[in-house]
């Protein structure tokens, strides 16, 4: 027997001893005493003895994670050794090489990459300034996908709209040959719901303005901070329609623009922006698995996206998710646990530019999506998890989620009643294919202070919060994978 095999066997024996102790504690605590005698086979239940063992294993995974996981080390490595990882760039390719290497070091086998093509946008330079009435520079950043100005830039009068709805309603003559500025009132929320409401200001606004004859488009950054650090993010030009340069102002600079316009004397701004588009570039998803011993064709998917924007180092979005999910899977592997089903870790490529990796994954795996049991993604920074929800469609699935919630309660995580499909942005293509999802809701009250800015760096993350996330992911992933419970109704 080689040294590593002997070490794993020794770990396995220690783990089984620990499982027995934890199982006794769980029984005394009443966590496993309320198991129903049986659940219908149609719902895919497992027997109570197996469930008790799974719960004991999950409790140990939870406790090991909160005592210190690899999550912070992983995200620190990614953001230091690779840095920003713009979709389709050489840096994103280096990130894939990094991911394969780290997965191998963690013995997360087998490992593969699944490639796809995309058009790769690049930022080169950006500048904005007030020409009149009060000359001064403005802090701006180009939206992802924006076209350039001419080499000489463009100068125009700014017209203000307080909302996207106001721009939609404006007559063409109010917009034509002007630089459009759209404001908004994004609110700080725990669940980030305000982002979804105001996101169309960024994604749809440029084309609405262009169709009305605007020269360029400015918006207040979709963020909740008060720093002169503008927030980038993708726009979506309408196909076969005019395209105009589009930039985000930092929130303090947006305040400045609104103050100047409030005086009623007009505002003239000059913009200079250089970007480029590589028509055909490469990206890929990076995948690692722990193969199931009883039903390896059944898959529990967890993951995060590997790409990032180019302003910061992509620590919060989504290096944290990469670290959390990799560390959770590594914890299961290190424990010597082999689930009934396959656990598949997917690090999606090119999420920031339209969920391209997630769409490619759906298309490349159409033939097996019926066997995707459930999925969950970490893509909301490194804040502590505070709520668990799942869109289970079966009684047995609901019961297993309730057991997950019992084990997560000591982490400060409460069960939620919302069954809205979701689980994370990269899971939406799978949701459309009928795959159930589970969501570990993170506290996002400060997430949009940093999101898509130069301030998205690893010093903003807290190791203890990441460990709590790892604990939660390890628990739910293990329990879903080491079960034959169905979360979706039989066809």
Residue spans for each PLM region:
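Noncatalytic luminal/extracellular "stalk/propeptide" segments of secretory-pathway proteins
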Residues: 47, 53-60, 76, 80-179, ...
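N-terminal capping segment at the start of a domain
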Residues: 49, 53-89, 229-234, 307, ...
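Soluble metallo-hydrolase cores and metallopeptidase-like ectodomains found primarily
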Residues: 56-57, 132-172, 235-315, 327-330, ...
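Second-shell loop/turn segments in exported
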Residues: 58-65, 80-91, 156-161, 190-206, ...
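Short helix-loop-beta-strand segments that form the rim/entrance of peptidase-like active sites
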Residues: 73, 330-356
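Extracellular/luminal Protease-associated
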Residues: 89, 139-245, 313, 415
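Metal-dependent peptidase/peptidase-like ectodomains
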Residues: 135-137, 244-247, 254-255, 295, ...
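His/Asp/Glu-rich mid-to-C-terminal helical/loop segments that flank catalytic regions of hydrolases
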Residues: 330, 448-491
């Amino acid at each position: 027997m080689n040294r590593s095999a002997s070490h794993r066997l020794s770990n396995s024996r220690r783990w089984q001893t620990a499982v027995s102790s934890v199982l006794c504690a769980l029984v005394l605590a009443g966590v496993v005493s309320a198991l129903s005698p049986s659940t219908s086979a149609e719902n895919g239940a497992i027997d109570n003895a197996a469930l008790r063992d799974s719960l004991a294993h999950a409790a140990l995974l939870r406790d090991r994670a909160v005592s210190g996981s690899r999550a912070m080390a992983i995200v620190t490595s990614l953001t230091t050794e690779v840095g920003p990882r713009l979709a389709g760039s050489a840096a994103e390719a280096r990130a894939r090489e990094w991911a394969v290497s780290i997965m191998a070091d963690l013995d997360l086998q087998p490992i593969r990459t699944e490639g796809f093509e995309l058009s790769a946008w690049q930022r080169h330079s950006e500048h904005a300034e007030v020409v009149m009435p009060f000359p001064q520079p403005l802090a701006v950043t180009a939206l992802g996908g924006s076209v350039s100005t001419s080499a000489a830039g463009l100068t125009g009068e700014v017209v203000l709209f307080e909302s996207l709805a106001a721009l939609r309603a404006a007559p063409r003559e109010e917009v034509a040959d002007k630089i459009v500025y759209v404001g908004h009132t994004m609110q700080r929320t725990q669940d980030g719901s305000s982002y979804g409401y105001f996101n169309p200001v960024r994604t749809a606004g440029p084309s609405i303005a262009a169709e009305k004859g605007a020269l360029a488009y400015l918006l207040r950054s979709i963020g909740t901070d008060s720093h002169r650090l503008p927030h980038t993010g993708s726009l979506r030009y309408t196909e076969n329609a005019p395209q105009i340069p589009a930039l985000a102002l930092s929130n303090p600079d947006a305040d400045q623009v609104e103050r100047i316009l409030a005086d009623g004397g007009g505002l003239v701004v000059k913009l200079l922006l250089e970007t480029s588009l590589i028509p055909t570039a490469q990206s890929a998803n990076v995948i690692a698995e722990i193969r199931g011993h009883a039903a390896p064709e059944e898959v529990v998917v967890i993951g995060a996206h590997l790409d990032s924007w180019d302003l910061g180092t992509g620590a919060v979005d989504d290096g944290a998710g990469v670290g959390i999910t990799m560390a959770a899977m590594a914890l299961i592997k290190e424990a010597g646990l082999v689930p009934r089903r396959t656990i598949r870790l997917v690090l999606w490529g090119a999420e920031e530019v339209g969920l391209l990796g997630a769409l490619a994954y759906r298309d490349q795996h159409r033939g097996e999506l019926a066997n995707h049991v459930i999925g969950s993604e970490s893509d909301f920074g490194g804040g502590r998890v505070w709520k668990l929800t799942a869109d289970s469609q079966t009684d047995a699935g609901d019961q297993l989620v309730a057991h997950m919630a019992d084990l997560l309660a000591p982490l400060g995580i409460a069960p939620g009643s919302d069954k809205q499909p979701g689980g994370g942005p990269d899971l939406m293509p799978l949701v459309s294919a009928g795959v159930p999802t589970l969501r570990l809701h993170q506290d996002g009250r400060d997430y949009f202070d940093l999101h898509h800015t130069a301030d998205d760096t690893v010093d903003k993350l807290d190791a203890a919060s990441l460990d709590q996330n790892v604990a939660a992911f390890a628990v739910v992933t293990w329990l879903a994978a080491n079960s034959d419970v169905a979360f979706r109704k039989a066809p």
